[in-house]
């Protein structure tokens, strides 16, 4: 079954196909689709910024549509990034600008690479707010940072050697290892004694705090309410 999180209709079709299949209940759901500023620009057919819809809104619809099919003690992981809190030398004044400005950015914001950082912040807001709203204390919902990985297709093959060198030289603490991060992600899904909920795991099975901005409950609620208004016709 195919799914494209940059299309709400595609997400709806996937959910319909899954419900009509014989797969049954879902134990684990990993929301890993994503593009960066290097590969994503413009609007989707739904009229939203392509990074916002691919990285956040499509997952928002997917998770909420599949919640009734989740095992009671299942696990959901939203793949975010430590770039939800960009380095100060990258942007010293990174503040929440409002969900609508991210979903339908003006000309200046539509060209900004900060759209990726904001989308990863949205992943964390979604994680925290989802836990508050579902009321299922057995369903474990967490966020994960795999680290910077130029060997993946996050940038659509458009990342340059110069950019890779820049990250390694200026942000070495943010570089990830594909094998190690993949294993950590698998462990977070399969570990039998795992009990953590609402945490952010950084390239391992050890959780760390997210940015101060990410704990703003007002922002998280605003994002949820607006996202719900955008996807309500696709359930």
What does each model-found stretch correspond to?
Residues 42-43, 105-106, 162-164, 203-207:
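Surface-exposed beta-strand-to-loop junctions
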Residues 167-208, 217-219:
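C-terminal helical subdomain
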Residues 1-153, 233-235:
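Rossmann-fold NAD(P)H-dependent dehydrogenase/reductase core
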Residues 52-55, 115-120, 173-178, 216, ...:
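Aromatic-acidic/polar surface patches that form glycan- and anion
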